[in-house]
Amino acid sequence: QKNFSLLLRIWSKIAPSYPDWKLEIIGDGALRPALEEEVVQLGLSPSVELSRPTQEMQAVYLHSSIYAMTSRYEGLPMVLIEAQQMGLPIVSFACPCGPRDVIHEGEDGFLIPLGEEDAFVRALRQLMDSEAERQRMGRAARLSSARYDVDTIMAHWIQLFDTLSVTPSSTPIS
């Protein structure tokens, strides 16, 4: 689902041109040994860090410049909202749902047609080449994330319940 092998292939096309940049993948699980081997096979050991899960994700986001997601499918990925809250521009495949609901194309990130590896590379390069673009999209991302704020969501729920409570029922309840 997360398609980390594709992310590593994409990174292998970018890393030689950006020796000061690092790709950090955070997680654990059954696929970790295969990913570790793939990092070595692609010669990416100097530029890829496979980190264990942490409770300090806020610190990770604060030390990041871009959030990249190569998932083939998602629900509503909280990691995208968290990344936006921390002011990170996002590059993600436009899965059938999830990222399309969070990212505004060209404003706070890039939605790449599913499987278009070269387009993903171009979007990452565009952001990596321009700190001003990262900052502009990061500010927009932070503003976009406000729609998921607890107070905003609660206001929508209250409005919905208020509407439902004053709308007469067309079917009597017995």
What name fits each language-model region?
Residues 1-13, 23, 30-36, 118:
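A conserved mid-protein helix/loop that constitutes part of the nucleotide-sugar donor-binding site
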Residues 53, 72:
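Aromatic "clamp/platform" in nucleotide-sugar-dependent glycosyltransferases that forms part
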Residues 58, 65, 87:
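A short alpha->beta transition loop at the rim of the catalytic pocket in nucleotide-sugar-dependent
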Residues 82, 94-106, 110-111:
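Short acidic/histidine- and often glycine-rich active-site loop of Leloir-type glycosyltransferases
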Residues 89-93:
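Short hydrophobic beta-strand element within catalytic cores of glycosyltransferases
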Residues 104-106, 110-117, 126-131, 146:
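Conserved acidic donor-binding segment of nucleotide-sugar-dependent glycosyltransferases
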Residues 119, 126, 133-147, 156-159:
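A short, well-ordered alpha-helix in the C-terminal region of glycosyltransferases
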Residues 150-174:
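C-terminal alpha-helical cap of glycosyltransferases
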